[in-house]
Amino acid sequence: TSIVQRAEVSQRRINELLDQKTDLLSEENIESTLAGALEVNHLSFVYPDSGVQALRDISFSIAAGQTLGIIGTTGSGKSTLANLLMRMYDASTGEILVDGRPIQQYSLASLRSQIGVVPQDVFLFSDTIANNIAFGLDQPNLDRITQAAKDADVYQNILDFPKGFETLLGERGITLSGGQKQRVSIARAIVKEPKILILDDCLSAVDTKTENAILNSLQKIMKNRTSIIISHRVSSAKLADQIIVLDEGRIVERGDHGSLMEQKGVYAALFEKQTQGGESVEESAH
């Protein structure tokens, strides 16, 4: 029947994906618990397929538990840097050290299990809210799911739905607002209690008021956890201990919010433009 034929084609495609071998090999398969210190030395990256150079001679370090803001416009190399920190690719030149060890020495599964990522485009399954948050846990744990929802400031929203955590999302269920989606995505990233948290321009789709509310709840989540806030909005990165400004794959400025404003360069210009352009940067987020 046509359904069986369609299923066969789908299975073939899935098998092709499952049979693919990764080029990323772990040199020593280290599986230690991370503290979260990161050091990037003279990192450059060229995309192998297109030959486009996305990053040029990037260097910075973050102590365990600190927050780094990475600011830049579209195409500046922000997300490429996030992908390298998750070891989706290996650097063309230079190195990334995690807790003083080259990133290649860690077991990929162990490394990635300790990194929580909130992507720009949230993908939620047609499943319950609980299962969407629990995605990434080996065993669903209601206490951890509940705590993650509270930390992401979406717990009360969930309780307001008729079936609470068992509420279905997607085609057969309800549709969440942009802010609720992002909060569920944040809960999903932190439910596995990662040592490193990467926010990849994840607040670009929400309005400023929602952004400030989410940033306030993120402050608690980021405390004592190495966090990287990637954004084109200055308001998202204001909280960071250290901020780097990327332009065409290079670091053009670095400092904290105050010192970067005093430099009156790219960062300050972006801040002024975004503040005047209606993307108000409220002090409440500080």
Give the residues covered by each predicted segment.
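Cytosolic ends of transmembrane helices, especially the final helix of ABC transmembrane type-1 domains
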Residues: 1-17
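ABC-type nucleotide-binding domain
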Residues: 25-26, 31-286
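Signal-transduction coiled-coil helices of two-component systems
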Residues: 4, 21-24
